[in-house]
């Protein structure tokens, strides 16, 4: 039940939802409506009116000792949601801090067949209720429910004419000051709204429970907005006859115009709240003409946060840490062991990349760096290296046909020089013979030298990549999988960005991304975590993580 954690703090169902299995074992009437899955989970069909009624009656009996009857043709209340409203009224009138011996008086406008608010308020707090009802069936059931629970001395159910709210109901009791009024107004203005045809977002899923309310319970002229405005109009005449006026709303969009109406009318004290239960949310509005009442603070605005993501991690094994410590000591560093030496090497790599970083406060046995990447310098280095190897591969090389033609020409020149008897010709031929082979050898040697150089650097590059892969497999545990998975696509994304020539200044932000890096002990090893903060692309952080990991391994391998 997604919204249960947002229930009223005193709601008994907030941290302990109803145990259907226990209730089914104790109450036969409820047992016939539950289903048990193959996994042993007990569930209830909230689309079945009889099942919903059985749950409400069972909860009232089990948790409050109340026995009620509700017709299937009328609204079946959910107990946790109604309990939220009762607890909020307690907050409004200061019930928790007041003398419990002082009788509190309330009015329930349209109490319904269950008469649930008066029954709960009287049972929990000993409040006196005047409960009004316009529907004959609801009135009869409400009276019966009050009588069978022996609460007639605290709850008075009265039948009133249609459209009667507060003014007519209080005509006979002009001297009594009530502490509060409660109301669940009809939410809808017509049948289309009641069926959700023209009021629900098309992307919103359908209601998860059945609606059994009668016409007067769920529909009124103008819907809940106009209904509550009529209560506001009555309150402007009654004013201090009630300390608090309140209503529950089914639509959030009704809240703002009603608050604006109260502001226009000059009502001095106004507050609101939210009621949460399961996947259902309701809103409540309260106002008062008393200056001495304590106004509960409205709920704070909850920011919609991104779903928390796991950090990108890699582990530096104890053996690797030891090698890093030896190298750090040889360089005369102060940090030569544990997380300090890993942090020091990472700081050096970041500095070489010109990635901004600073140390920030952190927990015990760990160090933290706040990292801000301005440009994608790590991909630039990899690209330059790949480009150099590619150029060496593509150096010009003479073809076999050219080499053969040059060899034939040399042989023909040798044969011509041998046929000349003149000493001068011999000398010239010999010089020619010496020059031609020298030129030929020089060209061949140059080609071979370039080939050898290209082959050697390419071989070194391939060996380096192979060593890097082996070291990665040997030194990093499964925690680095998230970084490895992001490396390939992230590199492509980085290349694409660079090819387009987009500098940070050309974007709306002056940085690529920000992250928090934690370096901490994990047994004998050291764990490096990178937590995303904000930026253009999370893949960029994957790239940097992969680069840092590989550079740390390269330090040990070199």
UniProtKB/Swiss-Prot annotation:
Activity regulation, per record: Methyltransferase activity is autoinhibited by the K-loop region that blocks S-adenosyl-L-methionine-binding. Upon activation, K-loop changes conformation, allowing S-adenosyl-L-methionine-binding and subsequent methyltransferase activity. mRNA N6-adenosine-methyltransferase activity is inhibited by zinc.
GO biological process: mRNA catabolic process; mRNA destabilization; mRNA processing; post-transcriptional regulation of gene expression; regulation of mRNA splicing, via spliceosome; rRNA base methylation; S-adenosylmethionine biosynthetic process; snRNA (adenine-N6)-methylation
Chain residue ranges for the region called RNA-binding: 17-20, 199-211, 250-254, 277-283
Tagged with keyword Methyltransferase: yes
Biased composition (Polar residues): 477-488
MF terms in GO: mRNA m(6)A methyltransferase activity; RNA binding; RNA stem-loop binding; U6 snRNA (adenine-(43)-N(6))-methyltransferase activity; U6 snRNA 3'-end binding
InterPro entries xref list: METTL16/PsiM, METTL16/RlmF, SAM-dependent_MTases_sf
Catalytic EC class: transferase
Catalytically driven reaction(s): adenosine in U6 snRNA + S-adenosyl-L-methionine = N(6)-methyladenosine in U6 snRNA + S-adenosyl-L-homocysteine + H(+); an adenosine in mRNA + S-adenosyl-L-methionine = an N(6)-methyladenosine in mRNA + S-adenosyl-L-homocysteine + H(+)
Name this protein carries in UniProt: RNA N(6)-adenosine-methyltransferase METTL16
Organism: Gallus gallus
Gene coding for it: METTL16
